[in-house]
Amino acid sequence: MTINKETGTDPDPGYKPTLRSQDKAALKELLHTRLVECGWHKDIKEMIRNIIMERGVDNINRDQLAAQIVPQARALVPEVVKNEMMLRVHAALDK
């Protein structure tokens, strides 16, 4: 069988590796622990409080708050945490 751009190189192009539910739970717990340890969790809670104080609790809803916080929160995740999680996810997928 020849391999070209049309046929691809994957033996099963429909195959997508998935994480087991135990692995997902363990990874979520690890991520939460790392974010608390590095102070990210505290910083995000403070950002949320500041936004609510500035705009007033009656002038902002959950969706507006999330739209404002999520991009900043993602950008503030330390690279070391991102790298560790990436390695752990790849290891879990290779099982």
From Swiss-Prot:
Tissues in which the UniProt entry reports expression: Expressed specifically in testis.
Domain of life: Eukaryota
GO biological process, one term: transcription elongation by RNA polymerase II
GO-annotated cellular components: cytoplasm; DUBm complex; nuclear pore; nucleus; SAGA complex; transcription export complex 2
Protein family per UniProt: Belongs to the ENY2 family.
Descriptive protein name: Enhancer of yellow 2b transcription factor
InterPro entries: TF_ENY2, TF_EnY2_sf
Annotated GO MF terms: chromatin binding; chromatin insulator sequence binding; transcription coactivator activity
Protein role: Testis-specific paralog of the ubiquitously expressed transcription and mRNA export factor e(y)2. Cannot functionally replace e(y)2.
